């Protein structure tokens, strides 16, 4: 089962590293990770590109706020299940997404 995870970002370089790291540690084998950045002015995009091998798509363009950004991510997603991981959030443990997939 493919799980799509969407993170909306804007100038998130101070918090995003830990978010990316928590996703990198996930054990579920089929994760589509989409990051939607609202044209950050800091080093958010550079941080994403240099610290995450699981990012499937990066959408970087101005948006009308977090809900617009999340909707762009949903439109780009191809997973059976779609979830959100905000740029200052962490997944609690390494099997979190695998456990979510088991419920479906």
How does the language model describe each region?
Residues 43, 68, 89-103:
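Acidic donor-binding/catalytic loop of UDP-sugar-dependent glycosyltransferases
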């Amino acid at each position: 089962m493919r799980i799509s995870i969407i993170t909306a970002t804007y100038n998130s370089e101070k918090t995003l590293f830990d978010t990316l790291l928590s996703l990198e540690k996930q054990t579920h084998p089929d994760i589509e990770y989409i990051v939607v950045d609202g044209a950050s002015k800091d080093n958010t995009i550079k941080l994403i590109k240099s610290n995450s091998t699981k990012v499937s798509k990066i959408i970087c363009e101005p948006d009308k706020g977090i809900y617009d950004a999340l909707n762009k991510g949903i439109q780009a997603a191809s997973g059976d299940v779609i979830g959100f991981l905000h740029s200052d959030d962490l997944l609690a443990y390494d099997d979190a997404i695998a456990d979510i997939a088991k419920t479906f």
